[in-house]
């Protein structure tokens, strides 16, 4: 299991007068780092949405500071940050910051549906690099450096970040709003009719993605595996509502081999999540690591009540896109 105690974390209280356009990273946090921050970093909220931000170093006789600059204002606007909001940043040691936001009443803010203000908000098929996750760290338990020198801290922004960018057009796809996509894929996917038969069919290699791409025939979304999602896997309410899905309290996860894992659907402050212990055991059994992605495909009968979810674990990159309802799906473009 990922050792959460090793997280590099800091917090900030949002003050619009000082933090609307850029955000100062605490110098004490910079002192903890074993390597410089990249020139471009990624902020990810609790349901897996990403924003690209630039970092800037100010090194003068008066002070030494590192900022989030370009892209931060979009993140603040999209998250509707208000005076006194409490933000916790968890850094993966590479280029990714997971952000948890608490309102001034002490409770987590409802992430809700955001409306992006510019292209600094990214979907995985557009600007996510291969190496924005931590090095693979195997799960071992189902229940769940030294400081750099001053010179290195002064060079804390790497001038040559290795960021891969795929220039792909924006594409919005959901199962119900784009039925023609499912018609194209039903001829090639799951031919045996077995709901547990999740197959991949070869396609031409494109834009660095895996050569074989699975085309789901059922409503689905894609989730990055992060430290947060290993502990708590939330189901996007926008996904469930846009596809007219009602979840049974007791469901089964069906993996690629056809093995089924029973678990419960629980209510939480923003909707629904998988029961903690059962989800952790599923993760451990499949040796999930932080570079994985999970494709969740919902088997929905005519009554709209779902009790089975197909799960495919992917280690490489996927051609995904962000829907207008702000969850990731497989890009169905030919």
Curated annotation (Swiss-Prot):
Keywords carried by this UniProt record: DNA-binding, Nucleus, Repeat, Transcription, Transcription regulation
A cellular component annotation (GO) from this entry: nucleus
BP terms from Gene Ontology: regulation of DNA-templated transcription
SUPFAM superfamilies: DNA-binding pseudobarrel domain
Full protein name: Putative B3 domain-containing protein At5g66980
Main localization category: nucleus
Pfam families: B3
PANTHER family: B3 DOMAIN-CONTAINING, B3 DOMAIN-CONTAINING PROTEIN OS03G0621600-RELATED
Residue ranges the UniProt entry marks as DNA-binding: 8-105, 218-317
Subcellular location: Nucleus
Taxonomic lineage of the native organism: Eukaryota, Viridiplantae, Streptophyta, Embryophyta, Tracheophyta
């Amino acid at each position: 299991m990922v050792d959460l105690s090793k997280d590099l974390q800091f917090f900030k209280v949002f003050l619009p007068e000082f933090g609307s356009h850029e955000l100062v990273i605490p110098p004490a946090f910079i002192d903890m780092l074993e390597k410089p921050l990249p020139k471009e970093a990624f902020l990810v909220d609790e349901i897996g949405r990403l924003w690209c931000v630039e970092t800037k170093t100010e090194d003068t006789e008066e002070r030494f500071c590192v900022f989030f600059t370009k892209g931060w204002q979009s993140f603040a606007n999209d998250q509707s940050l208000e005076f006194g909001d409490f933000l916790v940043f968890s850094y993966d040691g590479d280029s990714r910051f997971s952000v948890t936001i608490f309102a001034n009443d002490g409770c987590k803010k409802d992430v809700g549906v955001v409306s992006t203000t510019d292209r600094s908000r990214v979907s995985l098929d557009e600007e996510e690099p291969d190496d924005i996750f931590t090095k693979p760290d195997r799960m071992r338990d189902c229940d769940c450096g030294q400081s750099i020198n001053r010179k290195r801290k002064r060079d804390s922004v790497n001038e040559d970040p290795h960021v891969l960018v795929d220039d792909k057009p924006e594409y919005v796809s959901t199962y119900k709003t784009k039925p023609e996509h499912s018609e194209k894929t039903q001829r090639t996917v799951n031919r045996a009719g077995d709901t547990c038969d999740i197959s991949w069919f070869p396609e031409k290699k494109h834009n660095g993605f895996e050569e074989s791409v699975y085309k789901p025939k059922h409503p689905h979304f894609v989730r990055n595996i992060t430290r947060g999602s290993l502990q708590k896997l939330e189901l996007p309410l926008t996904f469930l509502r846009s596809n007219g899905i009602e979840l049974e309290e007791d469901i089964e996860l069906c993996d690629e081999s056809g093995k089924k894992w029973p678990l419960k659907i629980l209510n939480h402050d923003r909707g629904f999540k998988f029961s903690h212990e059962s989800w952790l055991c599923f993760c451990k059994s499949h040796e999930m690591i932080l570079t994985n992605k999970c494709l969740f495909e919902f088997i929905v009968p005519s009554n709209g009540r779902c009790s089975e979810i197909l799960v495919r674990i992917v280690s490489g990159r996927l051609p995904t896109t962000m829907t207008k309802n702000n969850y990731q799906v497989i890009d169905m473009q030919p």
